[in-house]
């Protein structure tokens, strides 16, 4: 018998079978490729979510600070409050002489020479044994007793903002540092003014309404502006709190700044 033909047929069948078996193998490769893509996409998504979670954790531990856009006359204030080892200069000498190591208290004329000054809308004057710092209706009085050019005692009285200023005032009284106290009060008044401007702009550009001096609301959502003291620095920092999801507010402020961040937060939460 001629087995060539049958052998050829068998080979052909084998080849055919081999070709047929290749097709599902090829299809399987396609499926695996698509699955691999999905796996990679899921891994990328998980990485993004993990990075976002880490960023939010970092933001939750970071105080949000608004850049001080208000023009400050700190050079004058620093000149007023700076320390110097030289003794109190004679009133007949030039006003450009270095300031005394402590604010002069025993000599009223000397004290008036250095402290009767206006910094824009903030006025610092002397009355009897007190230094008075005024801005509008606000008054802070600093009563200090000096002995041998060192402050022996100091008392600070405020006619407003006692709670907000309490940490820095307590620190200044404990350390008898009138320079820090005066600088802190001036900077606090200015940052309160900055908060007022920001709140007005947010209310004007959004559906938020003003609930109090430092709080705005949108339905049951509240956002409030506060000052935070990072002692011993006399410069207060801005702290913005909400009664809803704090991390989202912090993230949006970090991304867009305070004004736009608060507005976006309102439209996101409501």
Curated annotation (Swiss-Prot):
It is found in: Nucleus; Chromosome, Centromere, Kinetochore. Keywords: Cell cycle, Cell division, Centromere, Chromosome, Coiled coil, Kinetochore, Meiosis, Mitosis, Nucleus. Signal peptide: none annotated. The keyword Cell cycle applies. GO terms for biological process: cell division; meiotic cell cycle. Residues 107-270 are annotated as: D-RWD. Residues 1-30 are annotated as: Disordered. It comes from the Eukaryota. One of its GO terms (cellular component) is kinetochore. Residues 1-19 have a biased composition (Polar residues). Residues 31-63 form a coiled coil. Component of the heterotetrameric kinetochore subcomplex COMA, which consists of AME1, CTF19, MCM21 and OKP1. The COMA subcomplex is part of a larger constitutive centromere-associated network (CCAN) (also known as central kinetochore CTF19 complex in yeast), which is composed of at least AME1, CHL4, CTF3, CTF19, IML3, MCM16, MCM21, MCM22, NKP1, NKP2 and OKP1. COMA binds the centromeric nucleosome-binding protein MIF2, and to the outer kinetochore MIND subcomplex. Component of the kinetochore, a multiprotein complex that assembles on centromeric DNA and attaches chromosomes to spindle microtubules, mediating chromosome segregation and sister chromatid segregation during meiosis and mitosis. Component of the inner kinetochore COMA subcomplex, which connects centromere-associated proteins and the outer kinetochore. COMA interacts with other inner kinetochore proteins to form the inner kinetochore constitutive centromere-associated network (CCAN), which serves as a structural platform for outer kinetochore assembly. The D-RWD region contains a double-RWD domain which is involved in the interaction with other kinetochore proteins. Belongs to the CENP-P/CTF19 family. This is Inner kinetochore subunit CTF19. It comes from Kluyveromyces lactis (strain ATCC 8585 / CBS 2359 / DSM 70799 / NBRC 1267 / NRRL Y-1140 / WM37) (Yeast). The gene is CTF19.
């Amino acid at each position: 018998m001629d087995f060539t033909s049958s052998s050829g047929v068998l080979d052909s069948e084998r080849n055919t079978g081999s070709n047929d078996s290749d097709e599902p193998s090829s299809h399987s490769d396609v499926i695996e490729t698509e699955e691999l893509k999905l796996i990679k996409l899921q891994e990328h998504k998980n990485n993004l979510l993990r990075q976002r979670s880490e960023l939010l954790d970092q933001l939750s531990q970071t105080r949000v600070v608004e850049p001080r856009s208000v023009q400050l006359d700190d050079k004058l204030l620093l000149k007023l409050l700076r320390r110097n080892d030289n003794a109190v200069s004679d009133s007949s000498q030039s006003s450009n002489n270095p300031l005394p190591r402590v604010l002069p208290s025993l000599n009223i004329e000397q004290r008036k020479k250095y402290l009767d000054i206006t910094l824009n809308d903030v006025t610092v004057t002397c009355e009897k044994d007190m230094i008075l710092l005024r801005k509008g209706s606000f008054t802070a009085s600093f009563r200090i007793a000096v002995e041998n050019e060192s402050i022996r005692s100091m008392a600070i009285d405020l006619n407003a903002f006692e709670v907000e200023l309490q940490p820095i005032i307590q620190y200044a009284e404990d350390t008898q540092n009138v320079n820090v106290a005066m600088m802190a009060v001036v900077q606090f008044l200015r940052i309160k003014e900055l908060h007022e401007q920001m709140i007005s702009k947010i209310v004007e550009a959004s559906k938020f309404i003003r609930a109090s001096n430092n709080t705005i609301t949108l339905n049951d959502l509240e956002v409030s502006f506060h000052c935070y003291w990072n002692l011993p620095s006399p410069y207060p920092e801005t702290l913005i709190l909400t009664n809803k999801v704090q991390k989202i507010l912090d993230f949006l402020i970090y991304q867009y700044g305070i004004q736009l961040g608060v507005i976006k937060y309102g439209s996101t939460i409501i």
